[in-house]
Amino acid sequence: MDYEPDPFMDDFEDDKRVCLSCLKDVGLRKAFGHSSGKEQGNCSFCGSEAQETVPALEIQALIKSRCMSGKNEAVNELSYCTAEGGYLVGIYQPDEVLESLTLHAVGDEFYGALNEKLNIGNLYCDRAHNMLRPTERWRYGWKGFIETVKHKCRFFFGEHTHEPRDEFDPTEISPNAFLRHHVPQGIERLQAVKTLAAGTTLYRCRITEPHVTVIEMEHIGPPPASDCVGSNRFSPPGIVMFYAGETPDVSALEIGWPDCDGKVLHNGKFRTLTDLTVLDFTNLAYPDGQFDPDWIDGYHIAEFFKDFIRDLSAPILDQRRKPLDYVPTQVLCEYFRFYGAKADGKSRKLDGIKYPSSHDGTPCYVFFWGKELAGKKILLEDLTTAFSRRPATPKGT
C-alpha cells in the first residue's frame, strides 16, 4: 500500500509491526481485526513475541487521518501578523493534536514512537476557522429548526425563506435541509431503523376517577380523535397516536402517576401481533472508540445525535409551555410518519418511534396508530389497577 508523505507525521518504516496489545482504543482494535495484513510475528514497539501483528503503517494512517480531520496547516489557513507576534487565532502544536486523541488510545511504547515521528516545525489550526465546525453546524441547524417551527413558520416552513445566521458561511444548514437531509442522513448512518419483533410486550396506562370502568381495549387504547385535545411530545391536538412503555413503571410515570390524588391507575399489558418497524433512538450504532475506521469522516454526526436525543426526550417542567415546546418533536414525528426513513439505502415505512423516557431513560414508544389500526397491531392481554395514596403536588411547585 502506498502512503503519501504527510507534513503532520513521518511514516513508519515498512517492516514495523504492531500487536493488538499496543492498541487500547476500541476503534483501533476494530481496524486491527479488519486488516488483511495480519501475520504472526514480533511487535516492533512493546517487544511482544509470536503475536498476531499488522503493519504499523496501517494503524498510523488511521491515526493521522483522524487527527487531521477538521485541521489544516496554519500557514495554509491563517495570516501571520508580525506586529502582533504571530497568528491571531488558536493554533496547535503537532504533539497537542496527537495527545488530544491518542494519549490513552495506544500503549506507551507505540505512543512514544508516534510522537517521535511528528514534524515539530509545523503548526495547525481548525480548518475553515472562521466558519462553524461540523458538530456546531449541525447544532445550529437544530436550533434554527426549533426557532422556525416555534416562532416563525410552522405549517409551510419548508417554503419559509431562511435568514442565515452568518452570510459568510455557505455551509450553514437551513431548517428545511436539517429536517429533509441531515437528520435522515444521521438516522441511516447510526442504523436507527429497527424491527420490533412480533410478541413484544408493551404497557400503556390510563388514569381515571374511581367510578370509571376500564375493562377492554376500547377503554385503554387510542382515544377517539374528538377526545384527543391535549398536546403530546410527538402528537398535536387532534392527531391520535398510541403511546406505550417498555415497563409498567415507566408507562405510569409518563402520564403523571403517582402524583394523582384519589385517582385510579389502569395499566394495560399488550402484545404486538406483527413485526413492526420503528425509529429507535435508544440504541444507536455510535462509533467504536476514537478511531473507528468506519466513522473517520462522520464523528460530528455521532456527537450531534447524542445531544439531539437528549433534547427530544428532555422534560418540560412548565406545563404551560408544553403546547409550544412540543412543536419541534411533533414536526419531526409527522415527517417520519409520512416519509419513513432509510436503512441500508432502502426507504422503510415506519410504524413508530422508540425514545428514552424523560423520567428515567427507560424506552418508550409512540406508534402512528388510531383506534382501528391499533386493533390490528396489538392485543390487550391483561389489565391491572392501582389506587393513588400520594397527594397531588401543588400547582406551581
Labelled PLM ranges:
Residues 238-244:
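A short, exposed loop/beta-hairpin motif centered on an aromatic-Gly-Thr core
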Residues 248-260:
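Short active-site loop/helix that positions an aromatic residue
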